[in-house]
Amino acid sequence: MENLNEFLNCYNEKDHSIALNNRNIYVSYSGDYKGNPINHVHNSCELLFIEQGGGEYKIRDQQYHIEKNGVLIIGGTDPHSRRFTQVPCIRYGLTVLPAFLQSLPVINSYMNVYRTHSPEEANKLRGIDDVTFNRMVSIIWQL
């Protein structure tokens, strides 16, 4: 992509919400410039890739801190809230419906990957080196 900024927040909020609950695979590129909190739940598993900034997420009753070059996995139907602590917070979101994943034979045995991790497991996805993180982002852009 030549100019990523043209894709930043380029979605309708209502369509975005519908996609989170109904599309097999959905990719978003968003940036928030205020630390405003938000609480929500959706059917899809959510993988967040933080490009810049950071925040605190509460998933079920567990707290998670995420910052630049970090990845956070949120299981489908897990209520979660977020508050940005470093703005702007620029992130990629990849959401996948669990039923779609379960329909793929090669993925079915790996379904635990798409559930919310414990805070200890989530720490393993923090501070990913630039080369690896950028490769993950380039894969998302191909979806």
Regions found by a protein language model. Name each.
Residues I25-H42, E51, P79:
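Conserved short histidine dyad/triad with adjacent acidic residue
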Residues G35-H42, I59, R82-T85, P105:
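Short histidine-centered beta-strand/loop micro-motifs
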